[in-house]
A protein has these predicted regions:
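Alpha-helical interaction segments
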Residues: 8-10, 70, 81, 119-121
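Structural motif
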Residues: 18, 97, 122-124
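Surface-exposed coil/turn segments at beta-strand junctions on protein surfaces, enriched
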Residues: 12-14, 93, 120
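Generic preference for well-ordered secondary structure
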Residues: 3, 26, 96, 100, ...
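Central antiparallel beta-sheet cores of small beta-barrel/beta-sandwich binding domains
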Residues: 33-107, 111-112
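Glycine-rich, aromatic-bearing surface loops/beta-hairpins
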Residues: 102-104, 108-150
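Amphipathic/hydrophobic helical signal segments and adjacent flexible N-terminal regions
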Residues: 1-69, 133-150
Length: 150
């Protein structure tokens, strides 16, 4: 019998919905490098091949915008991404925490680790990326988001 996605990854299932927030990029020395607004759609789907879908939209004050989509498979209590942009996985640590690791296919010799904390009400989350290139920490990204649609 196939388990429900929410049973396999209950913390990730709490992220289902639409989120808005702010990304702030810092150098490894703590200087602000960039910042932008975000709108993320995170969906647990009925799809057997890709039970997880995410669409990220970023907007900057100067009018720039970027949008991309991610689809993920689920195996052994992890979701696995392999898109044109990234390759990696996400797993649960405890009742509030997700961990991710991935590479950016367009940035050679880069890899990322991300920790996501969701609150008890499942309506606010904080995320931190550690961005490495050539095994050296080059950036940290701090993200604060609020759920706007369940």
């Amino acid at each position: 019998m196939q388990k429900n996605f929410s049973d396999v990854m209950p913390v990730l299932a709490r992220h289902n919905g639409e989120w808005t927030g702010d990304y702030i990029y810092f150098s490894s020395q703590g200087e602000i490098l960039d910042r932008h607004k975000s709108h993320l759609i995170c969906r647990i789907t009925a799809g057997e091949k890709y039970p997880y879908y995410q669409q990220n939209t970023y907007t900057w004050n100067d009018g720039r915008a970027e949008q991309f989509e991610l689809h993920a498979t689920c195996k052994q209590a992890r979701i696995w991404f392999d898109t044109d942009r990234i390759q990696g996985s996400c797993w649960e640590i405890d009742s509030k925490t997700l961990m991710l690791n991935w590479i950016r296919k367009d940035i050679p010799k880069s890899y990322f680790y991300e920790m996501i904390q969701i609150n008890e009400a499942s309506d606010a989350r904080s995320r931190v990326w550690h961005w490495f290139e050539n095994d050296v920490l080059v950036k940290r990204v701090c993200i604060s988001e609020t759920k706007v649609i369940t």
